[in-house]
Amino acid sequence: MVNYPNGRSRAYSTVPKKKKSLTELSVTKKSTSKTKGMVAFGKRGMNFEAEINATNEYYLSRGLAVIHKKPTPIQIVKVDYPQRSRAKITEAYFRQASTTDYSGVYKGHYIDFEAKETQQKTVFPLKNFHEHQIVHMSNVLAQGGIAFVLLHFARLNETYLLPSSCLITFYYEKGGLKSIPLSHIRENGYKIETNHIPRIPYLEIVNKLCEVQ
């Protein structure tokens, strides 16, 4: 019998546990192997954001560019202090990001971009973009930076780089349309041919943007 400070007690059985037979051990082993296989299979695919992050890590490790994902702002609501030297956040909420997803430096150029994904096949919904992000990209362009968006059509498995200038023009001047036609993206953007390493080689297209700037 073990007595706990809260007054509760727990009795431990002295009856020896029955050993599993060879058959039971075999079944357990097969079941475990199957579960591990299911987990491994589930981790095989990477989402769009993870692929971009892996690409950025590749660029950084090769000394090609320094580009990082901006952390999502958090609104802290409640903090507990179990000890004077330790604080524990017990309640917090994600706040809406004020700018774009990624920023960094490439060949002396400031790089700033947003990454979005859609299940649509023929259009990219503009509701995926917030006006403050459009304003931010406009400000980046005004200061001589390079801004763009990476758009991924999941069901088509197609990824495009669209210069922010094209997005901004479409956002404000196309009569209140709620989406960008894929045909417009293909005409004004650049298709990214995905590789094994790096997965999304977008710097190949950024080179072109640097040349025309």
UniProtKB/Swiss-Prot annotation:
Q: Which GO terms describe its molecular function?
A: endonuclease activity; magnesium ion binding; nucleic acid binding
Q: Please state the Enzyme Commission number of this protein.
A: 3.1.21.10
Per the record, the GO terms for biological process are: chromosome segregation; DNA recombination; DNA repair
Q: Name one GO cellular component term.
A: cytoplasm
Does the keyword Cell division belong to this entry? no
Q: Which cofactor does it need?
A: Mg(2+)
Instruction: Keyword check for DNA repair, yes or no.
Output: yes
Could you say which residues are annotated as the site Transition state stabilizer? 116
- Kindly list the places in or outside the cell where this protein is found, as annotated in its UniProt entry: Cytoplasm
| InterPro entries (UniProt xref) | Resolv_RecU, Restrct_endonuc-II-like, tRNA_endonuc-like_dom_sf
Q: Give the family per the record.
A: Belongs to the RecU family.
What is the recorded name of this protein? Holliday junction resolvase RecU
List the gene name: recU
